[in-house]
Amino acid sequence: MKKPTRPGLTLSLVLLLAAAAYAAEPASIQGNIVEHRGYKMAGLTVVAINQDSPTRYETTSGPTGSFTFDDVEPGVYTLVTECEGIERIINRVVVQPEKAAQVELTALAIRPTENTAIDKYIASTSAQGGSYPGGNISYLNLNDDQDIYFMVLYFGILGLLSVYGVYRYRLVYLFLRYKDFTPEPKSRFAEDDLPRVTVQLPLFNEMYVAERLIDSVVNLDYPRGLLEIQVLDDSTDDTVPIASAAVKKYFDQGYDISYHHRADRHGFKAGALEAGLKKSSGDFILIFDADFVPRPDCIRRAIDYFTDERIGMVQMRWSHINADYSLLTKVQAIMLNAHFVIEQTSRSRCGGFFNFNGTAGMWRREAIEWSGGWQHDTLAEDTDLSYRAQLMGWRFVYLLDEDVPAELPAEMNAFKSQQKRWAKGVVQVGLKMLPRIWRDPRLPLRVKLEQFFRLTGNLAAPLVIVLAVINLPILIVRYNQGFFHLFVLDVPILTFSTLSVIVYYFVSERHLYPKTYSKSLKYLPFVMSMGIALTFSNARAVIEALVGVKSPFVRTPKYGIENHADSSWLGKRYFPRRLALPLVELLFTAYFVFTVWYAVHSHIFATLPFLLVYLLGYAYAAVMSIVQGRIGLRRTNVIGK
């Protein structure tokens, strides 16, 4: 028996076996040969060989692909069909007297070396008339080994992503289980016993939002004598006079507010917080980035949790000032909502570790100092300190129902830069902290596994790029093998990977907006595409972190956008203009245009939703980056003149 060297163009060989009604009468074998997309194969030689005797029957499939062996002796037969361009099809069939046997067989054929080698056997080009709708069998061919390599790589990567998909399902399950377990303070501070709080405002070139931030912080509802405000400014532009003037204005009104300017930016944000902590007098440290606008009752909502001396940090949920400004800001809001609703809630309420998000959180001073203080060997100083503090035994509280509004980036390059910094920082923290976490005998296995998935999740970015590159070769394999033969593997993998993402965002939006969440559902395809759009910048971040490449803390530009009509930000300073990455994204856009065409041309329609997610993601990222960059450059030049 000749073993097929490889799976290639799949033929569905459907055989209807009819045994003789009586033992005395010979049996017959009837069947049809059908190409995997439904075209019947004519002119193929079919041989039936009796395994118990030298008896051999031979026939040829007719114009409609059917064949018949009449007067066949009962017994065990091997059916063989073989011709140019088709791998030898072999199957065993048992023909018994007094029984009518039916069997379905699937046969594999090799891809022809000539495009027309199989074409002539398709009945539609001969007896049925007309031309073969698919043209030649395939204009794109791979050799045997390439097929195997691509399939192993493809399903291997999808398998890894599916593991993270299972983890995502677990987060959703934990959220649904614990979402009603709202944390309560151990007790409450009496008004006369309220502790002193220091509010730190780290700034770097925030000329458009610095004054807004300072104005909102001085209006916090807390005894003025117990509130210290530090403006920690590393700026090198007009932010310096703007921020210092705002500080002087409120200092003259009797507020305990001070302005601290550094010229060297040593340690970036972590360095500024570290320097400010040494000069602060508060027992508790509340931190806000420049894009936040805290509500007056912000401190009151968090301070009472510190009546429990084991609590080291209280984190509040982020909400969004400009979520409805554009498609980009809406998608960002949905992505951040899922993190703060699903991830932070599930981790905090099931006894696991979770991290301070860098802003809108309050720290106990001792928790910072006893855990080693602010360190700046990673770009995620907030996550780094969070893990060190929790390993020291400090407990954290997450307040899902208490939110602090913030401005979302409205520019694509700024958004990608922000996500790159976050991705690189988390991987750096993983390299630094995961060995300590796994060696700690006090931590249960579930906590260790939780932190492994949390700190390695960004490794998916380079894997998704590899999937993007091999999408077309995989389509060729699908075409030549038949889609449904691989579909058995696709269904469970896609259920765990792709469907888990949809469930993840759906549950978070439904929780936050129970009456209007359906309005967000139309954005889910764009959310998934945005995840694809970030793969290049995030993959670079991951690789840099893994090989130890150091980079500065690149701030995310903020422009003070709060309403739909505000387009003045397009000509403001800080407008990032990057050309190399959008050009790569354009190249991949063209690649996926061709891949989509190939899928349509080959009738592999079931893959189109996934291909369109890639296409939309890369196209949107590239076009927005280039268009916004050119508009910003033109307006900036006009303003400069």
Residue ranges with predicted function:
Residues V247-F284, P296-L379, Q390-L391, M412-T456:
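Long helical/loop segments within the catalytic core of UDP-sugar-dependent glycosyltransferases
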Residues N50-S66, D70:
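Short, acidic Ser/Thr/Gly-rich low-complexity loop/linker segments typical of extracellular
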Residues F175-T182, R188-E191, G457-P552, K558, ...:
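Membrane-embedded multi-pass helical conduit in multi-pass membrane proteins
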Residues Q30-M41:
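Structural motif
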Residues Q51-P54, V80-R92:
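A short, solvent-exposed loop/turn motif at the edges and junctions
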Residues V218-H260, R265:
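Acidic donor-binding segment of Leloir-type glycosyltransferases
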